[in-house]
Design a protein with these regions (language model features):
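Accessory recognition modules or surfaces
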Residues: 162-171
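Conserved active-site alpha-helix within GNAT-family acetyltransferase domains
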Residues: 112, 135-152, 161-163
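Acetyl-CoA-dependent GNAT
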Residues: 3-7, 11-17, 22-106, 112-121, ...
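Conserved GNAT acetyl-CoA-binding A-motif
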Residues: 122-132
Length: 178
């Protein structure tokens, strides 16, 4: 997209749970329709992308950011970090649980700005971890561009069907001593 509108990245709070849910469900459907079984997508979105799920993550200390565009701060992407839920996590790691962008805005400055916000917030952690579907080449390329490397694999359930994911990590620069 060459003509990107005025945009911003801002930290999201519990009051943004509906926007996180909407973007999470829309991007999951957009990314995996025709790849993952339709009923599985619906079940996954109902459970994993509900506003209640986002409120619960935020209440437990997760942090999220929204990418918004004008007019009216329309949500087009988001990222969320939380305490690691991945088996390959070590003490001091942080998990990039989700980073999603509507396809119209993928490959624009918004996606990189969203990742920069996440990396800045992760300062002081040892590594930033994430899981990604093993054949999602576009996402794998984006993560490689941002310093992530494959450290292992996991199985990921979507609506009762299991898929293979890569687990990626980015080593973070320690926070400066004060």
């Amino acid at each position: 997209m060459d003509d990107i509108p005025i945009w911003r990245i801002r930290q999201a709070g519990p009051e943004d749970a509906e926007a996180l849910s909407l973007v999470g469900s829309a991007t999951f459907l957009e990314s995996f329709a025709g790849v993952v079984d339709g009923s599985g997508i619906i079940a996954h979105c109902v459970h994993q992308h509900s506003a209640e799920t986002y409120r619960a993550y935020l209440a437990k200390g997760a942090k999220a950011w929204l990418a918004e565009v004008e007019p009216g701060h329309a949500p087009v992407g988001y990222a969320m970090v939380c305490a690691p839920e991945l088996e390959l996590a070590h003490a001091g790691d942080l998990e990039l649980k989700r980073i999603y962008m509507l396809s119209r805005y993928q490959g624009t400055v918004l996606a990189s700005a969203l990742m920069q916000a996440v990396v800045a917030a992760a300062s002081g952690h040892a590594r930033l971890l994430l899981g990604v579907k093993e054949d999602n080449r576009r996402a794998l390329s984006f993560y490689a561009k941002h310093g992530f490397e494959t450290i292992g694999t996991r199985r990921f359930d979507v609506g009762g069907k299991t898929y293979d994911d890569f687990v990626l990590a980015r080593v973070l620069t320690p926070a400066p001593a004060q």
